[in-house]
């Protein structure tokens, strides 16, 4: 019950998205399409995937996408379907993080909208376009080894956050946008379940990525706060989040849809402030 189909990784140019693209390549995907706002990074990660893949028949491509633009998302999705034939797995990792903390009493509306545009509307656009593409393709057996698992047209995994379920001080726009991702994922799962499409999200806490490093530099006291609330005593490495994504995409989670899979080192077991 391994990864065998085609993967579309949005936001795959770095951080968690890059780790997911590389994981699909090493876990046996047939083709990996790496999409990113930075086309050069997408092509570079695709080349890394090509080098790591165990199969000589594996292919990887880089695609440019701007998830805040409806036409760009539609065009990129259509391009991937045309090149790959179908999308079996979609991982939506594109997003922005807080670079400077702000209290509710002083947060500018433009900054709040900026987070919603990328983290929420962008997630919606990708989920919508990929849902439509998956509905148009033929169903396949989830697993030839376990035929009672039925058929599938695909699996979508969105990147949410531990801040989809709790809150932390000074980062209202991020928290609100990620709460919306969890709701979007649950409703998309309901809408898609009769079409044989599963939709889940991964909810990590802090991960060692450039986004978190920028947040630590811009939000006073965040580094100490993170250390105080993560029982495991460290932030995650991107590969640990990619492992959870691969599980939710693979046949091993064939009875899981609409879930917010928390991967947080125990963070939500403690008070967040």
Curated annotation (Swiss-Prot):
CDD domains: SDR_c. The active site is at 174 (proton donor), 178 (lowers pka of active site tyr). Disruption phenotype: Impairs the production of flavoglaucin and congeners. NADP(+) binds at residues 16, 66, 128, 174, 178, 207, 209. PROSITE patterns: ADH_SHORT. It comes from the Eukaryota. Keywords: NADP, Oxidoreductase. GO terms for biological process: secondary metabolite biosynthetic process. Its EC number is 1.1.1.-. One of its GO terms (molecular function) is oxidoreductase activity. Gene3D superfamilies: NAD(P)-binding Rossmann-like Domain. It is an enzyme of class 1 (oxidoreductase). The PKS fogA releases the carboxylic acid (8E,10E,12E)-3,5,7-trihydroxytetradeca-8,10,12-trienoic acid as its product, as well as derivatives with one and two double bonds. PANTHER family: DEHYDROGENASES, SHORT CHAIN (PTHR24321), SHORT-CHAIN DEHYDROGENASE_REDUCTASE FAMILY, PUTATIVE (AFU_ORTHOLOGUE AFUA_5G14340)-RELATED (PTHR24321:SF12). Belongs to the short-chain dehydrogenases/reductases (SDR) family. This is Short-chain dehydrogenase fogB. The lineage of its organism: Eukaryota, Fungi, Dikarya, Ascomycota, Pezizomycotina. The gene is fogB.
């Amino acid at each position: 019950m391994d990864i065998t189909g085609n993967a579309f990784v949005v936001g795959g140019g770095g951080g968690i998205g890059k780790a997911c693209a590389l994981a699909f390549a090493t876990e046996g995907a047939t083709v990996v399409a790496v999409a990113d706002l930075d086309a050069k990074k997408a092509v570079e990660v695709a080349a890394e995937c090509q080098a790591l893949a165990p199969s000589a028949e594996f292919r990887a491509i880089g695609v440019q996408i701007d998830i805040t633009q409806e036409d760009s998302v539609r065009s990129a999705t259509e391009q991937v379907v045309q090149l790959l034939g179908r999308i079996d797995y979609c991982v939506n990792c594109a997003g922005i993080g807080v670079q400077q903390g702000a209290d509710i009493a002083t947060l500018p509306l433009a900054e709040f909208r900026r987070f919603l545009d990328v983290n929420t509307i962008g997630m919606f656009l990708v989920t919508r376009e990929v849902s439509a593409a998956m509905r148009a393709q033929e169903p396949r057996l989830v697993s030839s080894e376990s035929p009672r698992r039925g058929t599938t047209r695909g699996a979508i995994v969105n990147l949410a956050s531990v801040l989809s379920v709790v809150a932390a001080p000074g980062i209202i726009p991020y928290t609100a946008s990620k709460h919306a991702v969890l709701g979007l994922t649950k409703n998309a799962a309901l809408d898609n379940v009769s079409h044989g499409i599963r939709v889940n999200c991964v909810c990590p806490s802090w991960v060692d990525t450039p986004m978190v490093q920028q947040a630590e530099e811009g939000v006073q006291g965040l580094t100490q706060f993170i250390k105080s609330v993560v029982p495991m005593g460290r932030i995650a490495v991107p590969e640990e989040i990619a492992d959870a994504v691969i599980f939710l995409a693979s046949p091993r989670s064939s009875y899981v849809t609409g879930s917010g899979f928390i991967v947080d080192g125990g963070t939500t077991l403690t008070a967040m402030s």
